[in-house]
Curated annotation (Swiss-Prot):
This is Secreted chorismate mutase. It is found in: Secreted. One of its GO terms (biological process) is chorismate metabolic process. It catalyses: chorismate = prephenate. It comes from Mycolicibacterium smegmatis (strain ATCC 700084 / mc(2)155) (Mycobacterium smegmatis). It is an enzyme of class 5 (isomerase). Keywords: Disulfide bond, Isomerase, Secreted, Signal. SMART domains: CM_2. The lineage of its organism: Bacteria, Bacillati, Actinomycetota, Actinomycetes, Mycobacteriales. Its EC number is 5.4.99.5. Substrate binds at R36, K47, D56, R59, E60, Q61, Q62, V63, T92, S93, S94, V95, E96, R121.
Length: 181
């Protein structure tokens, strides 16, 4: 709840102190990417508890096919969307690998239970659609000279509002590093 309030304030919604210069139009896209990254913990817990592999090339291909199809329907470059989601998947997978390593080194920190993987995947699929919608909405910004400063402001706002630790902050930076073209 606090993160939502902070993000709304950072985006200039409902706050008299925000100006057009304060808000980045990329906050909704970056926040969707951040929420998608945050699925790494429950997904890692599910895979850790079940003995499943972190990397799932078949699932990754399904995701890429779905988002590039959505890109085509939005009349935006599917190659661009492919690159964005490849980075997002790699960042999320890296967080999962980090969690596995932490739990291997400290078994007491390992989760004693985990949500069903299908629940996390439904959330991921919804966030994927949101991200493609936001990419389409922000296409002109993503391909303009103001993209980098807008992205930097959005990254700072979202990472702060979500209380990201260094692992998640670096993962978010990686997930978004190809946004500006």
């Amino acid at each position: 709840m606090l993160a939502s309030v902070a993000l709304a304030a950072l985006a200039g919604v409902g706050t008299p102190h925000a100006t057009a210069d304060d808000a980045s139009p990329l906050v909704p896209l970056v926040d969707a990417a951040a929420q998608r990254l945050q699925t790494a913990d429950p997904v890692a817990a599910s895979k850790f508890r079940s003995g499943g592999a972190i990397d799932d090339p078949d699932r990754e291909q399904q995701v890429i096919a779905a988002v590039t199809g959505d890109a085509t329907r939005h009349n935006i470059d599917p190659g661009y969307v492919h690159d964005v989601f490849r980075n997002q998947i790699d960042a999320t997978s890296s967080v999962e690998h980090t969690r596995f390593a932490q739990w291997k080194l400290d078994p007491a920190a390992a989760p004693s239970s985990a949500p069903d993987l299908s629940e996390s995947r439904q959330k991921i699929d919804t966030l994927n659609r949101t991200m493609v919608d936001e990419i389409a909405r922000q296409w002109p910004v993503l391909h303009s000279p103001v993209c980098r400063p807008d992205l930097d402001r959005a990254l700072d706002a979202v990472a702060t509002a979500r209380g990201f630790d260094p692992v998640y902050r670096h993962a978010l930076e990686y997930a978004t590093h190809s946004y500006c073209r």
